[in-house]
Amino acid sequence: MHGGGFYHVQKYTVAPEEMPAELHWFKYEAYFTWLSGFALLVVVYYFGATSYLIDPARADLTPTAAIAASLGFLIGSWLIYEALCRSLIGRSTPALAVSVFLLILASAFLLTQIFSDRAAFLHVGALIGTIMSANVFVVIIPNQKKVVADLVANKTPNPALG
């Protein structure tokens, strides 16, 4: 029950016997959460870079350089995460978990060396959110579309995609 309505959400090992008449994709929640968070990051920390993003006691950055560093961390962390997932490390859940934890820890340390405290730790959250949303956009949804296409074509879906 949520919002006055009843829902039946069930995860199948591979796929249901038949496709439901209406299929709800749980992707927009991730996309809109990231977009709204990024919009707030831009409005508060990028437009107010000299007040909120930059700490002159830590690094002598121009607003443009600080914003570039911010974007570099967000994009770079996702690229590193993707590389880890596609490497041998990605085949072992414990190894991947430790590697991602170390990535977040190293990022937090580096961010506190160049940004204000508040901006640094906000960026750690933004970094995690970026990784999660990008994973939904680049990996999860495309794979789910392949599974659905197989079901519609009466083929057996590849369980590795689910």
What function would you assign to each model-found segment?
Residues M1-G162:
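Polytopic transmembrane helical bundles with strong interfacial aromatic enrichment
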